[in-house]
Design a protein with these regions (language model features):
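A solvent-exposed interaction/effector surface
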Residues: 1-200
Length: 200
C-alpha cells in the first residue's frame, strides 16, 4: 500500500465518489481517500460464523457453483467481485459474517427472473453496499499480504481523524489466474468510517 497522499491529512473532508463507484478507476488509489459514497445494490451469498481458516473454500464454492448459474440466468455484474464483512472476531478461532458477490446497476430481481439460485445450501440473495463516508485504498500484491494491508489501512484511518466502522470490504479488481505474477494483483479496500463524535 502506498503512502498517504496530501488529501489524507487529519480532518480532511470527504470527496464525492467517482462515477462508476464502487469501481475506483483504472489506476490504483494513491494513499487513502475519503469518499461520500452512495448505496450500491448487490447480488451475494451470505454466510455467518465462517472460520477464517476455511473461508477460501467458501469463496471457491460461491464463484465455482453459484455465479456460473446466475450468469446463465442473466446476472450482469457492474464491477469486480467483492467480499463484505459485517462481523469479524479475532484470535486463533477467528470467524466472520460475510457477503460474497458482485455489485449491480439495479436490483437483482430485475436481472435474474428464474427460480432462486441455490446450490449445496448456498443461496444467491439481494443485498446492498451501504451509503456513507467510506475510506478507500489499494493493495498491490498477493492475497497473503491483505492482513498487513488492512492493519496499515486501519491505522491510517485513525490518523485522518476517523474511526473505522462496519462493514468493511475488499474488491478483487484483478481476477487471479494460475500463471500470473501475484505482485500484479490489485485489491481495493473499503471501510465505512465515522467521526469521533459519531463513534462516541
Amino acid at each position: 500500500m502506498s503512502s498517504s497522499s496530501p488529501s489524507s491529512s487529519d480532518g480532511s473532508p470527504a470527496e464525492a465518489a467517482p462515477d462508476g463507484y464502487p469501481m475506483l478507476g483504472a489506476e490504483p488509489v494513491d494513499g487513502v481517500r475519503l469518499l461520500r459514497a452512495p448505496a450500491v445494490p448487490t447480488a451475494v451469498v451470505q454466510a455467518t460464523d465462517v472460520p477464517m481458516a476455511t473461508i477460501a473454500g467458501l469463496f471457491d464454492a460461491v464463484f465455482g457453483k453459484i455465479f456460473p448459474v446466475a450468469f446463465e440466468q442473466g446476472l450482469r455484474p457492474a464491477g469486480p467481485a467483492f467480499a463484505l464483512y459485517t462481523r469479524l472476531t479475532d484470535g486463533p478461532d477467528a470467524a466472520a459474517d460475510v457477503e460474497i458477490g458482485f455489485p449491480l446497476d439495479g436490483p437483482l430481481l430485475e436481472q435474474v427472473h428464474d427460480d432462486a439460485v441455490e446450490i449445496d445450501g448456498l443461496r444467491l440473495v439481494a443485498s446492498v453496499i451501504p451509503a456513507g463516508e467510506v475510506a478507500v485504498t489499494t493493495h498491490l500484491g498477493g492475497f497473503d499480504g491483505l492482513g498487513r494491508a488492512w492493519g496499515e489501512f486501519i491505522g491510517e484511518i485513525g490518523a485522518m481523524g476517523r474511526a473505522p466502522g462496519i462493514p468493511f470490504w475488499e474488491s478483487y479488481v484483478t481476477e487471479p489466474s494460475p500463471d500470473m505474477d501475484p505482485a500484479e494483483l490489485r485489491t481495493d479496500l473499503y471501510c465505512l468510517v465515522r467521526t469521533p463524535d459519531d463513534a462516541a
